[in-house]
Amino acid sequence: MTEWEAATPAVAETPDIKLFGKWSTDDVQINDISLQDYIAVKEKYAKYLPHSAGRYAAKRFRKAQCPIVERLTNSMMMHGRNNGKKLMTVRIVKHAFEIIHLLTGENPLQVLVNAIINSGPREDSTRIGRAGTVRRQAVDVSPLRRVNQAIWLLCTGAREAAFRNIKTIAECLADELINAAKGSSNSYAIKKKDELERVAKSNR
């Protein structure tokens, strides 16, 4: 054995990166083919914490590469009093994921992905102005906007459910995600999505 061979250390196996040290991304399936490029959940985007401090707003479409749990965490930091309190929202998401696992026995990442797929509206209506008259026209929704809107609706539903309620926001977020993943109309996001699609259908 030469001196050089002795000096080279054996390459250690890269450890399996698990979110919060618990949840693996390996077995997460994205069943909607149109959203596969916009829900960043594969090993490439695996993180221990949903806090990468990346500059995802610097370029168009770059936010699609932001890990999906981090996007949920960022969206929970809404309404003036919560702005910038990312550690608080990381704690909320961690607690919510533990509740989801206790209630369903599934990987919370899979529940989150299913909830996002189910609560993103496929059709919406936009305002078209013609010669002084404004009418609404049904339009298809792009995949990135579907993901954006789904995350926003899920967080809004959890926030409104927790307001003036004995339940904590983590419990409300867990309930919202579980109901949305099932496609249940108890979910705020599913109700809003159905309403948007119904309005769009009437404006075709």
UniProtKB/Swiss-Prot annotation:
Modified positions (Phosphoserine) in chain numbering: S142
Location within or outside the cell: Cytoplasm; Nucleus, Nucleolus
Disulphide-bridged cysteine pairs: none
Top-level taxon of origin: Eukaryota
Pfam families (alphabetical): Ribosomal_S7
Keyword Transport listed: no
Residues with N6-acetyllysine modification: K47
Subunit details: Component of the small ribosomal subunit. Part of the small subunit (SSU) processome, composed of more than 70 proteins and the RNA chaperone small nucleolar RNA (snoRNA) U3.
Family: Belongs to the universal ribosomal protein uS7 family.
Function of the molecule: Component of the small ribosomal subunit. The ribosome is a large ribonucleoprotein complex responsible for the synthesis of proteins in the cell. Part of the small subunit (SSU) processome, first precursor of the small eukaryotic ribosomal subunit. During the assembly of the SSU processome in the nucleolus, many ribosome biogenesis factors, an RNA chaperone and ribosomal proteins associate with the nascent pre-rRNA and work in concert to generate RNA folding, modifications, rearrangements and cleavage as well as targeted degradation of pre-ribosomal RNA by the RNA exosome.
Name of the protein in its database record: Small ribosomal subunit protein uS7
The organism of origin for this protein: Mus musculus
